[in-house]
Amino acid sequence: MALRCPIVSVLGHVDHGKTSLLDKIRRTRVTQREAGGITQHIGASEIPINTIKKVSKDLLGLFKADLSIPGILVIDTPGHEAFTSLRKRGGALADIAILVVDINEGFKPQTIEAINILKQCKTPFIVAANKVDRIPGWNSSEGPFILNFNEKNQHPNAMTEFEIRLYENIIKHLNELGFDADLFSRVKDTTKTINVVPVSAMTGEGVPDLLVIISGLAQKFLEQKLALNVEGYAKGTVLELKEEKGLGKTIDAIIYDGIAKTGDFLVVGNPDGVIVSKIKALLKPKELDEMRDPKDKFKPSKQISAATGVKISAPDLDSVIAGSPLRIVPKNQVDAAKEEVLQEVEEFTILTDDEGIIIKADTMGSLEALANELRKVNAKIKKAEVGDISKKDVIEASSYASSNPLNGLIISFNTKVLADAKAEIEKSDVKLLEGKIIYKLVEEYEEWTKEMEELMKSDEINRLTKPAMIKILPNCIFRQKEPAVCGVEVLYGTLKIGSPIMSEDGKKLGYVKEMRDSQQENIKEAKVGMQVPVSIDGNIVLGRNAKENDILYVEVPEPEARKLHHEFKDELRGDEKEALSRYMELKQKIENNIFWGM
């Protein structure tokens, strides 16, 4: 029975070394070119069986492994939790997975999230315990770990430290999550126990062990799943849309099932539905090369079979979006393929809110991942689209901000900002957050939201009438009316220019027109304990409806008193709270309503 390459998914926490580990296998350097050192798009690499046998020759006899698979196809799935949706897609495509964990740091939130994804997809996995070279005293060298793990090559203290970190940082956590796990050389039953393979992406130690274990497990337990479908049409997922010299727009894709031929029809999803286009060329990357960053030209193929990474040349691909499902079929199966693809596209629809922000991304998967991560921090999303930031986006965001300043935001993941959009942003109140790492964008969103909420709260408090109690000082009446001028002491709260003043029996007396400090300079407010001359314009006549030693109050409208009492009480000083409390008690008595302001 002919077998296809098993599809291997690589998952793990950010910076635990997923792509670096693959680099060691491929002898390439993709990680250094990625934003923030974090892999941001699913990549695909074919590792042929001859390469696996070559680097693992010392182990094949030891493990009695007779490998008959043609090789492995690795999906380099992004490691940060922000890419949950892409990892789910990667996990779903994968036959088996490698979970990369730093043996020195142990499990992180993204590690646990990755395990949950693998559980959901029912994908078997092994653990690559990376960075073994950083264990104090460890003598790490390229080659099999199992041949280096002995007292001849390692100091006893280093071996003890290795055992401690292996158990405390990896095996114990797997046990807590319901998995039996052990060092791969000690595993008796691979159907019940997770294999933990120590590796070093820096030195290459353990890479042969990893390749033998992953290949052997895939072949042993997934043989039926790996049976090559020589009759069926090809099914796949779009990785990227790329411009290639001499070819125009092309699609990079992973084919995970079936056969495709030059001259077949490509059926692929886009934002408006489905595109059908006749294939001009199927191009394969040279073995051991990374699809999104090849160092050499692709080679043409008349026919390809799963599982493989492929570049597809065909007309009318401009509107294809990364992450879209695709089928490659003969002409008589186009209609059936269209129905299948449409169903998959509909699953990617992002639900939007009645109000909220705008998010844009470069791919369907990135957009979905960004939306999912923003939802986790309770973001409201009004519009979610793939594509560059346009002037229209900015105008829309500005209109959203008119009802709520928190909606005046555009978040852009890995997209361009068009020139007219930049000009529009400069003259608008719209905030733009740009980035190539989703979790950082989410962090920036949270920071911006917090700052905006504090600013909005501060603005709202400043617009509210602040409570205050004042006392007319004896021998300090300078003018009786129009306006009345006298000296007052602020007993509680904050007296501001424009504050409406009332007497203890609830009569309106006027509003504060002017205040001066001890230097006779005009001031806008006076706080508790201050004695200041004030002018009050209105019905007040000093000596008649207001006298020396009288207690006067700033009249706070009931809706504002209620807001201060319920929403902003923690923002008030102690004396302001006292002023508000006394004022509310007075109003409840005057209005004969114990619920006034409550």
Swiss-Prot record:
Coiled coil: none
MF terms (GO), sorted A to Z: GTP binding; GTPase activity; translation initiation factor activity
Gene Ontology CC: one annotated term: cytoplasm
Annotated segments matching region G1: 12-19
Limits of the tr-type G domain: 3-225
Spans annotated as G4: 130-133
Annotated PROSITE patterns: G_TR_2 (PS51722)
UniProt entry keywords in alphabetical sequence: GTP-binding, Initiation factor, Nucleotide-binding, Protein biosynthesis
Matches recorded under InterPro entries: EFTU-type (IPR029459), P-loop_NTPase (IPR027417), Small_GTP-bd (IPR005225), T_Tr_GTP-bd_dom (IPR000795), TF_aIF-2_arc (IPR004544), TIF_IF2 (IPR015760), TIF_IF2_dom3 (IPR023115), TIF_IF2_dom3_sf (IPR036925)
Binding-site list for GTP: 12-19, 76-80, 130-133
G5: annotated segments: 200-202
Region spans: G2: 37-41
Positions of the UniProt region annotated as G3: 76-79
Recorded family membership: Belongs to the TRAFAC class translation factor GTPase superfamily. Classic translation factor GTPase family. IF-2 subfamily.
PANTHER family cross-referenced by the UniProt entry: EUKARYOTIC TRANSLATION INITIATION FACTOR 5B (PTHR43381:SF4), TRANSLATION INITIATION FACTOR IF-2-RELATED (PTHR43381)
Annotated function: Function in general translation initiation by promoting the binding of the formylmethionine-tRNA to ribosomes. Seems to function along with eIF-2.
HAMAP family found in the cross-reference section: IF_2_A
Protein name: Probable translation initiation factor IF-2
Organism per entry: Methanococcus maripaludis (strain C5 / ATCC BAA-1333)
